[in-house]
Amino acid sequence: MEGGGGIPLETLKEESQSRHVLPASFEVNSLQKSNWGFLLTGLVGGTLVAVYAVATPFVTPALRKVCLPFVPATTKQIENVVKMLRCRRGSLVDIGSGDGRIVIAAAKKGFTAVGYELNPWLVWYSRYRAWREGVHGSAKFYISDLWKVTFSQYSNVVIFGVPQMMLQLEKKLERELEDDARVIACRFPFPHWTPDHVTGEGIDTVWAYDASTFRGREKRPCTSMHFQLPIQA
């Protein structure tokens, strides 16, 4: 421009371009923040998935109409169950087997024992524990809803139930079990059956019901007692 008072055109272009160029440090900081954002999102998402995977087996039973919560059996309860198995033989099933204590104890006494449990984490732990105790050949565990299992093949049935389910389970077992079967209830008795044997006190009380009794048929005599107490959980 003439007159010497203007700014050269080239200078104006350079200043305009410089306004749109961000400092290198700013770009690095933005990239780091973006990476941290993706990492944080991944961690939160992974944590939620893990919590869901772990919690679902525990929460699902609570959402059912009749739930069977996991409460580990005490050593005394296991001893009382084994007392009720004296003179008994054949297969045994634990309905809602939890961490496998009853099944493993029965397997150690010579029974072919099976546990049904809805919680897969407890089933996997029970299988590991049976292997560790050396009875994995005679102690089996399955992931299943007890209402979808038929118990007619078992001679001995053990249940740690809750009051809300005992009437319905009573009808199911009376319909499915053979006359020589025995049902052993822990913590809560069945509402209509009269127990043949009772042992223990308080939460350790165990009731034994013979199918021949609650059907009004003659019982088979006991002729032998082939194992001893005490046992350890």
Swiss-Prot record:
GO terms for cellular component: mitochondrial crista; mitochondrion. It is a single-pass membrane protein. The chain crosses the membrane at residues 38-58. One of its GO terms (biological process) is positive regulation of sensory perception of pain. The keyword S-adenosyl-L-methionine applies. Keywords: Acetylation, Membrane, Methyltransferase, Mitochondrion, S-adenosyl-L-methionine, Transferase, Transmembrane, Transmembrane helix. It is found in: Mitochondrion membrane. Residues 56-90 are annotated as: Required for mitochondrial location. Its EC number is 2.1.1.-. It catalyses: L-lysyl-[protein] + 3 S-adenosyl-L-methionine = N(6),N(6),N(6)-trimethyl-L-lysyl-[protein] + 3 S-adenosyl-L-homocysteine + 3 H(+). Contains an atypical, non-cleavable mitochondrial targeting sequence responsible for its localization to mitochondria. Belongs to the ANT/ATPSC lysine N-methyltransferase family. This is ATP synthase subunit C lysine N-methyltransferase.
